[in-house]
């Protein structure tokens, strides 16, 4: 049985950001790739710390506003235009510890190089990053890699360690080339999954639809494919191999697009809950639906444990009895049942859809 919990502001970012290790590894690899031998260890450390620094925006939170962290995470600290300032802040923070080894100007170059990688890596995922803030509030998401992917992180980490041990920038250069190739593979796989999604839509008589494919956790094989036709979202899982062969489709289902007027007719326009619903809609890029099990919960249906399910991992709960100044409640799903996990493995391996146990694709 699914278990939903009210999320604390400081504990709600579990899957909203690329894991810190990946950010540290990429942040270290770039400045290490041009580091002189005598400073390669120090530069690696500074780059790693600077690469993680933008995620300090998670400290922006409120005990009374549960959506504040959604509004500010991946915002100004992740913008292209903040990179020089972010690099400077990091350089000033690290300078007292390394000033006897390196000049401040070089420290600044290193920290800026590391800091600059963060927003770009986040934009490769699916959640959206405000790379052009403050000139645009568009959430840029290239949907090429999951927030956690060991096949991306571990090889690059190995090259960085080799670079430090061998005191050679050649190793991180090789690692960065490999990492870029993996991101390129994700780009190709995304397009292949979207092409399958377009075929599925056409087979249902749905034409001229915008199909979006999102990678599942830790791989670029299995994708959640979503498109909107009229007033419904349609969801399927698609596995596209990297060595050819026919893609495998794991059919999902459909759900009505959230319609505030008909589903929440009691919600006053100027109320805080109405404003929070609009904020959550912006965060989810419009992919909102009503939870089929709870008429007061709105889910971000882009993400689910199984890619062919319409069963959000997080959502907001509205309260009809709340006052005009009361915020919504932000909730996350914490339970992962064995059946769903087994079915996910079936999809990853590429077995037939008939091997999937019935947990209910909505």
Predicted regions and their residues:
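A generic structural signal for short, solvent-exposed coil/turn residues
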Residues: 50, 123, 203-205, 217-219, ...
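Polar-ligand-bearing catalytic/cofactor-coordination segments
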Residues: 194-210, 220-221, 231-244
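N-terminal membrane-targeting hydrophobic helices
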Residues: 1-215
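Extracytosolic and intramembrane catalytic regions of membrane-associated proteins
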Residues: 222-362
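Fold-independent oxyanion-binding glycine-rich loops
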Residues: 214-217, 300-302
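Residue-level detector of flexible, active-site-proximal loop/helix-junction positions
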Residues: 138, 218, 305
């Amino acid at each position: 049985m699914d278990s939903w919990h009210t999320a604390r502001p400081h504990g709600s970012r579990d899957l909203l950001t690329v894991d810190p290790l990946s950010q540290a590894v990429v942040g270290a690899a770039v400045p290490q790739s041009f580091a002189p031998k005598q400073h390669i260890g120090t530069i690696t450390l500074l780059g790693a710390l600077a690469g993680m620094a933008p995620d300090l925006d998670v400290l922006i939170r409120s005990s009374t506003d549960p959506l504040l962290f959604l509004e500010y995470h991946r915002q100004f600290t992740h913008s292209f235009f903040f990179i020089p300032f972010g690099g400077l802040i990091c350089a000033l923070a690290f300078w007292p510890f390394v000033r006897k080894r390196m000049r401040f100007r070089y420290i600044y170059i290193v920290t800026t190089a590391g800091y600059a990688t963060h927003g770009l890596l986040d934009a490769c995922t699916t959640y959206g990053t405000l790379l052009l803030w403050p000139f645009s509030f568009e959430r840029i998401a290239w949907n090429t890699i999951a927030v956690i992917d060991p096949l991306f992180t571990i090889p690059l980490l190995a090259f960085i360690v080799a670079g430090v041990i061998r005191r050679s920038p050649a190793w991180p250069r090789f690692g960065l080339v490999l990492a870029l190739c993996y991101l390129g593979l994700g780009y190709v796989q995304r397009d292949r999954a979207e092409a399958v999604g377009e075929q599925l839509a056409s087979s249902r008589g749905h034409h001229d639809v915008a199909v979006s494919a999102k990678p599942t956790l830790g791989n670029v094989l299995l994708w959640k494919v979503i498109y909107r036709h009229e007033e419904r979202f349609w969801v399927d899982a698609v596995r596209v191999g990297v060595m050819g062969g026919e893609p495998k489709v794991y059919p999902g289902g459909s759900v009505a697009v959230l319609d505030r007027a008909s589903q929440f007719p009691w919600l006053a326009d100027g109320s805080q809950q109405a404003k929070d619903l609009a904020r959550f809609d912006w965060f989810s890029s419009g992919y909102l639906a009503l939870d089929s099990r709870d008429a007061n919960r709105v889910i971000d249906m882009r993400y689910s444990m199984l890619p062919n399910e319409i069963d959000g991992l997080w959502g907001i709960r509205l309260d009809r009895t709340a006052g005009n100044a009361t915020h919504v409640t932000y909730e996350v799903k914490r339970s992962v049942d064995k059946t769903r996990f087994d079915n996910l493995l079936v999809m990853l391996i590429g077995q037939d859809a008939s091997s999937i146990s019935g947990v209910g694709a909505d």
